[in-house]
Each structure stands twice: as C-alpha cells, then as structure tokens.
C-alpha cells in the first residue's frame, strides 16, 4: 500500500482490541489520535517506546494513543497488564487488510517481512493527518517529543 500523507484525511481502519472486538478510527472522532505503530511488543525497543509514550501522552488533553502491531490481541493484552499500561489502547492489525493497505507501513522484505514498520502518526480532531514519522532503522526510537508537540498543537489549527 501507499504511505498516508500529512494534510490528508486519515483513512478509516478496523483493528482488533484485546476482547477481539473491532475498533475503527472513526470511533475516536472528536479526539486527537496518536498511532504508535511498531513490529512487535516482543522487540526491546518497542516495549520501551510504548512505556515512554504511555507516560507522556497521558498528559495530553482529549488525546487517544493507539499502539498498533501485528501481535495477537492476547499477547498485547498480557503485555499491557504486565507493564501496567492503562492509558494506551493496544490494537492488533493481524486481520486488518484495510490498515495494511491504506497506511503503507508493512515491511516488504528482510527478516521482519510482513510485520509493521515503526512509525508515529498524529491525527487531529477532524481526522486529518498532521504528523508522520517513519523510522527506517528498526532498533531506533521514533522522535516522540515531535509527535507529542504536534499533537498538542493540533487543536489550534
């Protein structure tokens, strides 16, 4: 799929939460949404990133953080419980062709092929993409500060 673009409407998607119910982006209409996308919770950088992000994002008003990976909902649920992550919503893309197609974040080759690349996307209250950072190197953290800053200012636009 093609990568989403800033200034455009974020495509709706269906992702699966830990109770196996589907969640749509449109369910969060009127809120700012930060998509924290990563290959798997079982890679060390991802665990760190989710933890750090959880802490910071919880301070933002009217903002939801969706942590999206190909991990099964059961694993995500277990991870969040173990880590005490209460303020992020873990969502699985394991059966979400629309997310994979419309966001263009699936890794195309190499050992991580088929998993989602590491990226942070900020969507404003009107559903417009305001910030995208695709991290080329799997072991690197995204620039969370930039994303949080963008999310914080997204209301004024």
Task: Tell me the role of every PLM-derived stretch.
Residues 1-157:
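Chalcogenol-based redox active-site neighborhoods
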């Amino acid at each position: 799929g093609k990568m989403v673009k800033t200034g455009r409407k974020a495509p709706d998607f269906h992702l699966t939460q830990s109770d196996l119910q589907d969640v749509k982006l449109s369910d969060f209409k009127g809120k700012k949404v930060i998509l924290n996308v990563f290959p798997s919770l079982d890679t060390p950088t991802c665990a760190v990133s989710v933890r750090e992000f959880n802490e910071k994002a919880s301070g933002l008003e009217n903002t939801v953080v969706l942590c999206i990976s190909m991990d099964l909902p059961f694993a995500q649920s277990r991870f969040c419980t173990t880590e005490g992550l209460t303020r992020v919503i873990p969502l699985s893309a394991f059966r979400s062709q629309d997310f994979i197609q419309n966001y263009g974040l699936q890794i195309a080759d190499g050992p991580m092929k088929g998993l989602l690349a590491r990226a942070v996307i900020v969507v404003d209250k009107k559903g417009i993409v305001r910030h995208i950072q695709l991290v080329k190197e799997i072991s690197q953290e995204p620039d969370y500060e930039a994303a949080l800053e963008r999310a914080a200012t997204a209301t004024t636009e």
